[in-house]
Amino acid sequence: MQFEKMITEGSNTASAEIDRVSTLEMCRIINDEDKTVPLAVERVLPDIAAAIDVIHAQVSGGGRLIYLGAGTSGRLGILDASECPPTYGVKPGLVVGLIAGGEYAIQHAVEGAEDSREGGVNDLKNINLTAQDVVVGIAASGRTPYVIAGLEYARQLGCRTVGISCNPGSAVSTTAEFAITPIVGAEVVTGSSRMKAGTAQKLVLNMLSTGLMIKSGKVFGNLMVDVVATNEKLHVRQVNIVKNATGCSAEQAEAALIACERNCKTAIVMVLKNLDAAEAKKRLDQHGGFIRQVLDKE
């Protein structure tokens, strides 16, 4: 795909004179363009759903979810991966974010990093990629060599692969087994794909990781029942989660949480089934950690 023909590099007529308008009008132009992003994501929901099902199947079989990107795309993958352990109680290595240029590139531009095909392959080798894993390549342009090479290597190993880009028919889309391509159009600032394209990528990543966690039993109703209480706010949230799930008082919720070492799932089953902590945990273990199955089948 020729650089000048890429949609993400096109000129946006709506912002052609954005440097001449008032600050408020500037904000309106940006906001109006941002409004189009969820609609672009909506058009690819079937592709996102298919990717979630594949990711869940692989993770259920012992695999990992690996995000691979450069620049903004890489940072978004790292952001999504880093939020999974505290929100859903998963091990830090289950969802991994890799960025061209390594850790330094999270805050700084690393010259030439995204153009390194070798870097994409080596980063995957360094985390001992296996055929059980799913690699999600993220690149707004769809032409980033670091990402393309990583996807090619992953497919050679037998991994399932997903490509997220904002240009139709891109190399990332055609290299990956599953393509997710929200077409957001030209950016307000020409070529600044951290804007609409980045927003679209963030929305897609939200769905991928959240969908995985819901299907893995980490959500009951709409409650994050595996949240890890690492601060006072989350201690309070745990109490509210148990209250909302069971209808018990705050005092009952806190007592149950203390009895089970602050595991929301166990506390919820304790209250709803009138069990002690050991028996509640045993039943959850018997049903793979799914509260719904414990309640529905017993």
Curated annotation (Swiss-Prot):
Induction info: Induced by MurNAc 6-phosphate that releases the repressor MurR from the DNA. Also up-regulated by the cAMP receptor protein crp via the binding of crp-cAMP to a class I site upstream of the murQ promoter. Repressed by MurR in the absence of MurNAc 6-phosphate.
Reported impact of D115N: 7-fold reduction in catalytic activity and 1.5-fold increase in substrate affinity
Domain (SIS) ranges: 55-218
E.C. code: 4.2.1.126
Keywords, sorted A to Z: Carbohydrate metabolism, Lyase
PROSITE patterns reported in the protein's UniProt record: GCKR (PS01272), SIS (PS51464)
GO MF, one example: carbohydrate derivative binding
InterPro entries in UniProt: Etherase_MurQ, Glucokinase_regulatory_CS, MURQ/GCKR, SIS_dom, SIS_dom_sf
A Pfam entry, by short name: GKRP_SIS_N
Consequence the record notes for mutating E83Q: Loss of catalytic activity
SUPFAM superfamilies the UniProt entry points to: SIS domain
Pathway per the UniProt entry: Amino-sugar metabolism; 1,6-anhydro-N-acetylmuramate degradation; Amino-sugar metabolism; N-acetylmuramate degradation; Cell wall biogenesis; peptidoglycan recycling
BP terms from Gene Ontology: 1,6-anhydro-N-acetyl-beta-muramic acid catabolic process; amino sugar catabolic process; N-acetylmuramic acid catabolic process; peptidoglycan turnover
Summary of the function given for this chain in its UniProt record: Specifically catalyzes the cleavage of the D-lactyl ether substituent of MurNAc 6-phosphate, producing GlcNAc 6-phosphate and D-lactate. Is required for growth on MurNAc as the sole source of carbon and energy. Together with AnmK, is also required for the utilization of anhydro-N-acetylmuramic acid (anhMurNAc) either imported from the medium or derived from its own cell wall murein, and thus plays a role in cell wall recycling.
Quaternary structure note: Homodimer.
Record-stated family: Belongs to the GCKR-like family. MurNAc-6-P etherase subfamily.
Protein name: N-acetylmuramic acid 6-phosphate etherase
Species, as recorded: Escherichia coli (strain K12)
Lineage of the organism: Bacteria, Pseudomonadati, Pseudomonadota, Gammaproteobacteria, Enterobacterales
